[in-house]
A protein has these predicted regions:
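Short, polar loop motifs at secondary-structure junctions
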Residues: 39-44, 154, 235-239
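Conserved S-adenosyl-L-methionine
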Residues: 27-88
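SAM-dependent nucleic-acid methyltransferase catalytic core
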Residues: 2-19, 30, 73-187, 191-201, ...
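Conserved acidic-Pro-Pro-aromatic motif
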Residues: 182-273
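Conserved proline-anchored active-site loop of SAM-dependent methyltransferases
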Residues: 24, 35-49, 53-59, 117, ...
Length: 278
């Protein structure tokens, strides 16, 4: 399958791997027939690899709605995005759509997807964050000329999603990896174990992700391994993470934080890459 060069992340997402791709690419397996990414996020790894048989998933229904809209009706999505204005008034009006459940539920899938992209492009630091009620709560970013529509990227992603055999799911990671065929490869990029008490960010989903969840994910990886399926997982290089994955191959890689509310704190931190293959 021809690689679509312009296919790249449409939204900025916490933990995005665009800046880490150069270090990650040599660590992926050479051959596999099916690819699964249960925490798709912005999709930087997906678009770098562009495999032919793919399952992408995320628990965040709004994010998955973006992928589905791009795949199903990119023309309508572009037209809807062109109607938004980069003003404080428009931003807070659109952000407030989810405060009224009756109103929000009447929106089309295109409206909902366009809203996510618009808010992501115009909110402060591109930080997708929801409160405990699942309502988007990042403030206006005051950017002079954000690329709200980004038509070339949208059309390239649409082409990839319709050229490859792509299944889009909105479920738990554990459900997403069920029944994978032999010679599958799974890349897992979950919410990270916090490196400090104040470093935790799981606001991309109202439910959060704690250490019990990390252990459950480790158990899922053990099951993948027992089933003969190759996996690779990214996480922070905390002692806890290195301990629970000590049965597998661990590589330490330095990574730059792509999203932080304080610019001076966007420094380098160590991450782990866990694999069940050489």
């Amino acid at each position: 399958m021809r690689k679509i060069n312009l296919a790249s992340p449409v939204v900025k997402w916490v933990g995005g791997k665009r800046q880490l791709l150069e270090r990650l690419m040599p660590l992926f397996p050479d051959t596999y027939t099916s690819y699964c990414e249960p925490f798709i996020g912005g999709g930087a790894v997906l678009f770098a690899l562009q495999p032919e048989n793919v399952i992408i998933n995320d628990i965040n229904s709004e994010l998955i709605g973006v992928y589905q809209a791009i795949k199903d009706n990119v023309d309508a999505l572009i037209k809807r995005l062109e109607q938004f204005e980069n003003t404080k008034e428009c931003f807070y009006d659109v952000r407030g759509w989810d405060r009224n459940a009756e109103f929000y539920n009447q929106l089309t899938d295109i409206d909902k997807a366009a809203r996510v992209i618009f808010l992501n492009k115009t909110c402060y630091n591109g930080l997708y964050r929801v409160n405990s009620a699942g309502e988007f709560n990042t403030p206006f970013g005051r950017y002079k000329n954000p690329n709200i529509v980004n038509e070339n990227t949208l059309r390239a992603v649409n082409e990839y999603l319709n050229t490859a055999d792509v299944t889009i799911l909105n479920t738990s990671y554990s459900e997403a990896v069920q029944g994978l065929p032999e010679n599958s490869f799974v890349y897992l990029d979950p919410p990270y174990d916090p490196i400090s008490v104040t470093a935790s960010f799981t606001g991309y989903n109202a439910g959060g992700f704690n250490r019990q969840d990390q252990i459950a994910l480790r158990d899922c990886c053990r099951q993948l391994d027992a089933n003969g399926i190759k996996f690779m997982l990214s996480n922070s290089a905390t002692e806890f993470i290195q301990d629970i994955y000590s049965d597998f191959n661990i590589t330490i890689v330095p990574a730059k934080r792509a999203i932080n509310s304080v610019g001076s704190k966007r420094g380098c931190v160590d991450e782990v890459v866990v694999r069940n293959y050489e």
